[in-house]
């Protein structure tokens, strides 16, 4: 076995030859790969090796010897520790180009048709774009309760200062709740002992409606002086439409438990996306960046070229957002989603918007798709998929290939699984377009809309 050319805790000078999918710098020493957070292609840096594995190592920057013109001053005090915006040190326009290049690189490696990936659609204002904030409640070294964000790759809570991607109202509400916790000496959840009451404070905001939901995640069923907390929050923030107590007594990393108790309002808020109104409950999925989500959906719907004669399948439909966008143009839309609460919300959303040609089915996409096609003999003209990060399962791919819909639109939150799946469709479909959309500015995350037409 060849000797590894680097040692832990030793310093080296390297040139950054590329950036990875999460924005990390990549360097080589004697053909041995080193990943360096915060480094940019073209830079020369002095690094300290912090971890060595058999195939690669990790380094951290000690000094930047030659700086890239893509680098900018970081405007966030917790940037290095938080890890929420791992590309904040790079100028925004350059992050968009890097995301396009990352998707193009995957296309070139995986697909026979080396289609040219379109430039990433960025935001006009890439600040304060998130409509959902999840603040863990923890204890600092002095024993005081704090709220904030988890330090990168740990469960240490970094006290919240000013986050440039969250909605400012979310921070204000969470800080007010924290003051109440401190003043009333209410216990805070400890992962090691599995004791203590407050776990998380989650805020959801309707960007267009300004309605706010506050979710108090607790390891128990009662909050001391609960009525007083509700009064403080609702008087100070009149936009709060509902406050929900979420019961999570499990020893788990999952933030929300399954039981919700409304302690103010009716347990949901509404927001507008395009011309539609959507009902958002504590457990329902709703795009975190609705400004970009609207652009994403419009691209997908436009690409599908839906007509009044078309039957459409919307797989992994969530709360029915894109289903409703498509229903306007289609004869019938079938939305499929495994999360039952999301399907309840989807049905409610169809009712709110007077859409009567969309049917929503709760169940495993693989099984429901199989049933629609092979038992009910419903053959779609258009299939729209928006799967989780793991991509499409083989059974769903086989069923789509079996029915060969004329038009097929794949919305993806993971370019690696997108191109893996596209390779399986290439014999039958032509990949017409791949459009990256920047849903999470200054992070390594990129969504793509991919349009496929039957050959």
Language-model segments: residues:
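Short, acidic/hydrophobic/Gly-rich beta-strand patch recurrent on exposed beta strands
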Residues: 25-30, 148-151, 215-217, 346
């Amino acid at each position: 076995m060849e000797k590894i050319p680097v040692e832990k805790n030793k310093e080296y000078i390297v040139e950054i030859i590329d950036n990875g999918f999460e924005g990390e710098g990549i360097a080589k020493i004697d053909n041995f790969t080193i990943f360096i957070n915060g480094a940019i292609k073209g830079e020369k840096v002095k690094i300290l090796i912090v971890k060595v594995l058999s195939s690669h190592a990790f380094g951290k920057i000690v000094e930047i010897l030659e700086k890239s013109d893509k680098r900018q001053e970081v405007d966030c005090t917790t940037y290095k520790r938080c890890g929420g915006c791992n590309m904040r040190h790079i100028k925004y326009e350059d992050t968009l180009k890097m995301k396009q290049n990352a998707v193009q690189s995957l296309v070139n490696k995986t697909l026979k048709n080396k289609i040219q990936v379109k430039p990433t659609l960025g935001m006009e204002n890439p600040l304060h774009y998130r409509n959902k904030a999840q603040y863990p409640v923890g204890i600092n070294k002095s024993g005081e309760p704090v709220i904030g964000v988890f330090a990168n790759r740990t469960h240490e809570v970094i006290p919240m200062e000013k986050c440039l991607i969250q909605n400012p109202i979310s921070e204000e509400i969470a800080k007010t709740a924290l003051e109440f916790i401190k003043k009333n000496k209410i216990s805070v959840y400890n992962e090691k002992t599995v004791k203590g009451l407050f776990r998380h404070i989650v805020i959801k905001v309707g960007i267009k409606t300004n309605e706010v939901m506050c979710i108090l995640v607790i390891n128990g069923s009662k909050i001391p002086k609960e009525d007083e907390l509700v009064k403080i929050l609702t008087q100070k923030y009149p936009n709060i439409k509902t406050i929900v107590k979420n019961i999570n007594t499990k020893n788990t990393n999952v933030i929300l438990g399954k039981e919700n108790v409304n302690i103010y309002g009716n347990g949901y808020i509404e927001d507008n996306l395009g011309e539609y109104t959507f009902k958002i409950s504590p457990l329902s999925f709703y795009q975190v960046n609705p400004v970009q989500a609207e652009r994403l959906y419009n691209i997908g719907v436009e690409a599908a070229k839906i007509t009044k004669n078309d039957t459409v399948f919307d797989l992994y439909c969530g709360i029915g957002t894109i289903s409703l966008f498509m229903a306007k143009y289609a004869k019938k839309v079938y939305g499929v989603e495994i999360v039952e609460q999301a399907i309840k919300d989807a049905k409610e959303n169809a009712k709110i918007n007077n859409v009567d040609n969309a049917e929503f089915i709760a169940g495993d996409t693989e099984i429901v798709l199989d049933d629609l096609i092979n038992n009910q003999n419903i053959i779609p003209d258009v299939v729209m998929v928006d799967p989780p990060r793991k991509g499409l399962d083989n059974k769903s791919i086989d069923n789509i290939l079996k029915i060969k819909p004329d038009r097929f639109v794949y919305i993806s939150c993971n370019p690696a699984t997108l191109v893996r799946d596209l390779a399986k469709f290439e014999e039958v479909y032509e990949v017409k377009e791949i459009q990256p959309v920047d849903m999470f500015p200054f992070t390594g995350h990129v969504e793509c809309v991919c349009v496929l037409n039957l050959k």
